[in-house]
Amino acid sequence: MKNNILISIIVPAYNVEQWIERCLDSIRNQTYRNLEIIVIDDGSTDKTPEILESYSQKEERIIVVHQENSGLAIVREKGIAMAKGDYVGFVDGDDVIESNMYERLLNNAIKYHADISHCGIKYCFYDGRVKMHWGTGDIKVFDRDTGIKELLSAEIIEPSLCNKLYKRELLYNSCLDVTIVNYEDLLRNFVLFQRAEKTIYEDFCPYQYWRRENSMSNNAELTKQF
């Protein structure tokens, strides 16, 4: 049964005291309930660690890890190593997801027998602007070669890890270089799309990527179009 499938969600968190509560609330309130929420505090110096401990006390699905500041790639590697889910997703600690995101991604992965299920991103700015691609509701299924071409063209497939649901086994040893800062998402996705026999894309935008300075994943590939 679908409800027996466990999804692990990896949340990197670094100095996100202003945003982490709304992020975790949006994950906790997912319509798909069988979640493992792994939050890795990457050496935060604000109140992020205390907030995370508070959430772990009231939500048994939340697992909190504290570590010295190591960078986004290493945080994700630790989360992948800890994950027990059949599928794995990523949410940045200052972002928000709509309540049905993982249920729809999982439904598509099952229906189309896909290794990666993904969707669009809504880019939210603190001055009130919102930008998103398309949002037509269309569904597109890609084989390996077509998926890689679409990823590199960036016309349909966003390079981010955060709008996708991956079969867990794809993710092992998928980081080319943990010292890379810019384009880490794109490079890792290039490896993952090479490993995936089939990917499924639904054109809806439930992932709210909030643009702010000093975000852990504030990479050039996510801003070039704006």
Question: How should these model regions be labeled?
Answer:
Residues 1-226:
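Nucleotide-sugar donor-binding/catalytic module of glycosyltransferases
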